Amino acid sequence: MENLKPFAVVALLEDKPERGLRRGQVGTVVESLAPGVFEVEFCDNEGRTYATLALRSDQLMVLHHDLVGVG
């Protein structure tokens, strides 16, 4: 999943207790930092950022809001 694009909505696949983040929290890709590494921003329901950190693609799952074909 190295081809994440800016503004992709993703879920965290592992806890990051040092940053106060838990598996399943939803964030937005801000930019690609290196191959397979992305800056992800986590915001509350009011749009206030509470964490921004670099994450590898294997720590993230892309979330889809539109119907996506399988197969």
Task: Label each PLM-derived region with a short phrase.
Residues 1:
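Histidine- and aromatic-rich ligand-binding microenvironments
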